[in-house]
From Swiss-Prot:
A GO term for molecular function: glutamate-5-semialdehyde dehydrogenase activity
GO biological process, one term: L-proline biosynthetic process
Main location per the UniProt record: cytoplasm
Superkingdom field: Bacteria
Family under the similarity heading: Belongs to the gamma-glutamyl phosphate reductase family.
Record pathway: Amino-acid biosynthesis; L-proline biosynthesis; L-glutamate 5-semialdehyde from L-glutamate: step 2/2
EC number: 1.2.1.41
Cellular localization per UniProt: Cytoplasm
Reaction catalysis annotation: L-glutamate 5-semialdehyde + phosphate + NADP(+) = L-glutamyl 5-phosphate + NADPH + H(+)
Alphabetic keyword roster: Amino-acid biosynthesis, Cytoplasm, NADP, Oxidoreductase, Proline biosynthesis
The name this protein goes by in its record: Gamma-glutamyl phosphate reductase
Cited Pfam families: Aldedh
PROSITE patterns, sorted: PROA (PS01223)
Length: 414
């Protein structure tokens, strides 16, 4: 507990210094971090192999090991992220709006850092880099608490980040990591309101709900991805098949992978067999409703399947009679992450977009695009499914708040 408090104090102190650093200083730090990751890549990969071995020994399924595993390309992606974020416009100091009152006061709404941020996350060591560089670019410090399954990887990555910071003008304490895997520290971290201004949980629904229910610090809720695709009766079936394949099989362990496929009854006989043939060859287990089972031989879907984020090569399939029925199903089971319609009908697309409440609503595109990098944000600290203060992929702007700056001429209120 003492170590946790000390590190929280350190990031709080660093956040005060970061408020006034220049964009040039921040960008230089990001480039130094990228260079340090390159120098330390062998050590990072070696540490990651330890984590992957431990995960396999525990019987963790392959789709989750994929989230944990690093390789040369993923290290290179981390390094490129440092360069990419350094090249993005710095939102801090941006004048969002300004006006002059009748009494002569000049009021400006100015974007500023949030302060010291805590992030609690599971499995994915690339989050360590992504969260750190986005925080630094926006003038925030960050206290990291990664999952025990990625412990060795995270420690090696943070060591590299701190080496990069030591060669910059930013405080080395801008990035700290909780070095204990004791789960009790998570509960204690959620009470450090004196030091942390925001908590960001990334991981399972169980983790996210625990943080939301137990934190005394404001939470940026990154949600579960129970994502749907509806294949409308006017859809181009060949193109629709490509999208369903991509959304399910490219990286099934991610939160933007599709979990439930809804198919209009008028094209079910044509689409379902071709879909089942293609996906089964890639190892996908299909669970279908009673109508689906009339067209293809699949495992029966249960009620719980409609509300499950599988994070695996499993797809729940339901045949619906209309667009309205598809919308009603999504409204009932959606986690508010990413939802898609595949259609050639403009009015159906418009109705779907207007009636689906999610962070990202797609027309004729894969749900896999819900990602800060794919949206042009340079990365993300998480994908928010809440409405305040940020929604969808949370990039640089989502890690800022604002203050009002008022310029007067010795004005007094009358």
């Amino acid at each position: 507990m003492e170590e946790l408090i000390q590190k929280a104090r350190s990031v709080k102190k660093a956040s005060i210094k970061l408020q006034s650093v220049s964009t040039v200083q921040k960008n230089e730090a990001l480039l130094q971090i990228g260079a340090a990751l390159k120098r330390k890549e062998d050590a990072i990969l070696k540490a990651n192999k330890m984590d992957v071995k431990e995960a396999r020994d525990k019987g963790i399924r392959d789709s989750l090991i994929d989230r944990l595993a690093l390789n040369q390309k993923r290290i290179d992606d981390m390094i490129q992220s440092c360069h990419r974020v350094a090249g993005l416009k710095d939102p801090v100091g941006e004048v969002i709006a300004s006006w002059v009152q009748s009494d002569g006061l000049r009021i400006s709404k100015v974007r500023v850092p949030i302060g010291a941020i805590g992030i609690i996350y599971e499995s994915r060591p690339n989050v360590t880099v992504e969260a750190s560089i986005l925080a630094l670019k926006t003038g925030n410090s960050i206290l990291l608490r990664g999952g025990s399954d990625a412990f060795h990887s995270n420690m090696a990555i943070v060591k590299a980040i701190k080496e990069g910071l030591s060669r910059s003008s930013l405080p080395v304490e801008s990035i700290e990591i909780v070095e204990s895997t004791d789960r009790k520290l998570v509960e204690q971290m959620l009470k450090l309101r004196e030091y942390l201004s925001l908590i960001v949980p990334r991981g399972s629904n169980r983790l996210i709900q625990y943080v939301v229910e137990n934190s005394s610090i404001p939470v940026l809720e990154t949600g579960v991805g129970n994502c749907h695709i509806f294949v409308d009766d006017s859809a181009d079936l060949e193109k629709a098949l490509e999208i369903v394949d991509n959304a399910k099989t490219q990286r099934p362990g991610t939160c933007n992978a599709v979990e439930t496929l809804l198919v209009h009854q008028s094209i079910a006989a044509a689409f379902l067999p071709m879909m089942a043939d293609r996906l089964s060859k890639k190892g996908v287990e299909i669970r279908g409703c009673s109508q689906t089972q009339k067209f293809i031989k699949v495992k029966p879907a249960t009620d719980s399947d409609w509300e499950t984020e599988f994070l695996d090569l499993i797809l729940a399939v339901r045949v619906v009679n209309s667009l309205d029925e598809a919308i009603a199903h999504i409204q009932k089971y959606s986690s508010g992450h990413s939802e898609a319609i595949l259609t050639e009908n403009y009015f159906n697309a418009k109705k779907f977009v207007e009636n689906i409440d999610a962070a990202a609503v797609y027309v004729n595109a894969s749900t896999r695009f819900t990602d800060g990098g794919q949206f042009g944000f340079g990365g993300e600290i998480g994908i928010s499914t809440q409405r305040l203060h940020a929604r969808g992929p949370v990039g640089l702007e989502g890690l800022t708040t604002y203050k009002y700056v008022i310029l007067g001429d010795y004005n007094v209120r009358r």
